[in-house]
Amino acid sequence: MIYVDESGVQKEMNPLRGRAKRGVRLYQETSGKRIKRDNVIAGYLNGLILALCIFAWSTDTEWFCEWFEYSLIPLLKPGSVIILDNATFHSKVYLPVIAEAYGHKILWLPKYSPDLNPIEHVWANMKTWLRNYSKNYLNIKSAVLDHFHT
C-alpha cells in the first residue's frame, strides 16, 4: 500500500515554542506580509518517499493526474493499492481510470482523517526540521531535498 499526500511549506516557518520567565506569557511578532509558499507532494511506501515533487503553484486536478500517472505510477509494482485522501483535486473520476489502466487500485480515506495516513507524520517531521534548519538554505526546495536525502 502506498499513501499519497501533499503539504504546503514555506522558508520562514515560525517556531512552535520559546522561552520566557515563569509566569510571563511569551509573544512573538509575525509579519503581515504574504510569504512565498511551496507545495510538496509524494508517495510513502514502507518508510520510503517516492516521486517527491516540490513546486511553487497550487495543485489542481489536471496537474495532480499528470504527476500521478507519469511520476508515481512508474515506480509502483503491479497490483499496488494507492491510498488517497479526499482533497478536491483528487479526481474520483480520472484517478481510478489511470490506476486501473496500470493494474493498480485506489482506496479513499474517510473525510477528515489524517490520522489514518502515515505520510502526515512525514510532513510533520519535515516541518519540524525546516523550522530549525531552513534559515541555512537559499530556498525551500534545497532545504526539503536536503531533509529527505540526509
Predicted features and spans:
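Short, solvent-exposed loop/turn segments at secondary-structure junctions
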Residues: S7-Q10, L45-I49, T88-H90, Y112-D115, ...
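Short, aromatic/basic amphipathic alpha-helical patches
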Residues: K92-Y102
